[in-house]
Regions:
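Active-site beta-loop-alpha junctions enriched in small/polar residues
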Residues: 1-4, 52-56, 84-90, 121-125, ...
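Short acidic/His/Gly/Ser-rich catalytic and metal-binding motifs that mark active-site loops
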Residues: 3-9, 158-162
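Active-site acidic/histidine proton-transfer and metal-coordination neighborhood
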Residues: 7-112, 214-224
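Histidine-acidic metal/acid-base catalytic patches
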Residues: 28, 32-35, 39-40, 66-70, ...
């Protein structure tokens, strides 16, 4: 993501060959590290490697398909590629990521035999609603391409974690009142994900920088307990 911010043409979905080539080169470096780590440990050390349909505003489905075809040919040391869906580009609202739509990513993944990772917060940012992550989970599950779901919050108000609708990995609502990611939403999305074939659930949240270990664990348990 840092490279996307530095170079507006950087991305696996860039129609500009130079920009796409830079992203391919980075992906190859990641595959080499994953392979070397697995070789060193004597078993597959990495299970999934997430990739994204960058760049912002300029993402092209055909370019992304071509990139994924190339990446599938690499040796990932036992890991598999998953596409993490980020907020799609919508002209009427400022993007956080602004990549391809979920439908475009699903179509590509179904063709190539790949799967999609849903990030709760990034889907909420896209739809400006807590309903969007649930809808995305259902859509990916019904298409047979749902790899898993990570619970990362978002909200419509400025808070300690940033401006409104920031992709800021807000905690769940009990720990951050402005977060739309309530325990009820976590529960229904978890159920839908498992029913949709998800292989894993996870959490990705920010915490107060001075939070003691006990508080950090409790904030993660809030999410964990809601998935059960």
């Amino acid at each position: 993501m840092q490279n996307v911010g530095k170079n507006p043409l950087f991305g696996l979905a860039c129609a500009d060959e130079e920009g796409r080539g830079l992203a391919i080169a980075q992906a190859k470096q990641i595959s080499e590290v994953a392979r070397e780590l697995s070789d060193y440990l004597g078993h597959a050390a990495v299970s999934k490697v997430q990739v994204h349909s960058a760049p912002t505003r300029l993402a092209d489905a055909n370019a992304f398909r071509t990139s994924l075809e190339e990446l599938k040919e690499l040796d990932w040391g036992g890991a598999t590629i998953v596409v993490e869906h980020c907020d799609r580009f919508i002209k009427e609202q400022p993007p956080e990521k602004g990549f391809l739509s979920l439908k475009e990513e699903i179509d590509i993944c179904r063709t190539l035999g790949l799967e999609i990772h849903i990030n709760w917060g990034r889907s909420a940012v896209e739809g400006r609603s807590a309903a969007t992550p649930y809808e995305h989970i259902l859509e990916a599950g019904q298409a047979g391409v749902l790899a898993g779901v990570f619970f990362s919050g978002a909200g419509s108000q400025e808070c300690a974690y940033g401006y409104a609708w920031i992709d800021g990995h807000l905690p769940a609502q009990p720990d951050e009142p402005s977060s739309l990611m309530s325990e009820e939403e976590i529960a229904r999305c978890s159920k839908a994900a498992i029913q949709g074939g998800a292989k894993y659930l996870g959490a990705k949240i920010c915490v107060p920088k001075d939070a003691p270990l006990e508080q950090r664990i409790r904030m993660l348990k809030t999410i964990y307990n809601a998935t059960r």
